[in-house]
């Protein structure tokens, strides 16, 4: 399953409701972006990060 490297955000599940309040299952997927970052040792690592975390954090991208 796709998961954010920073926040741990994954797919959420719930119901879609019609006007008659019938319930059918649906999913909300996180806006994950694949980026390359440097870790503590200076090695380049490819990870998936949510767009919200990408805006908030100051990561050293490659």
Curated annotation (Swiss-Prot):
Recorded GO CC terms: ribonucleoprotein complex; ribosome
S-adenosyl-L-methionine among keywords: no
Alphabetically ordered keywords of this record: Ribonucleoprotein, Ribosomal protein
Pfam families: Ribosomal_L28 (PF00830)
Domain of life: Bacteria
GO BP annotations, alphabetical order: translation
InterPro entries assigned to the protein according to its UniProt record, in alphabetical order: Bacterial_rp_bL28 (IPR050096), Ribosomal_bL28 (IPR026569), Ribosomal_bL28/bL31-like_sf (IPR034704), Ribosomal_bL28_bact-type (IPR001383), Ribosomal_bL28_sf (IPR037147)
Gene Ontology molecular-function annotations: structural constituent of ribosome
Family indicated by similarity: Belongs to the bacterial ribosomal protein bL28 family.
UniProt-listed NCBIfam families: L28 (TIGR00009)
Protein name, per record: Large ribosomal subunit protein bL28
């Amino acid at each position: 399953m796709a998961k954010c490297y920073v926040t741990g955000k994954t797919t959420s599940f719930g119901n879609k409701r019609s006007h008659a309040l019938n319930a059918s299952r649906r999913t909300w997927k996180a806006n994950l972006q694949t980026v390359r970052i440097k870790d503590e040792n200076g090695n380049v690592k490819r990870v998936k990060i949510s767009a919200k975390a990408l805006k908030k954090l100051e990561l050293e991208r490659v």
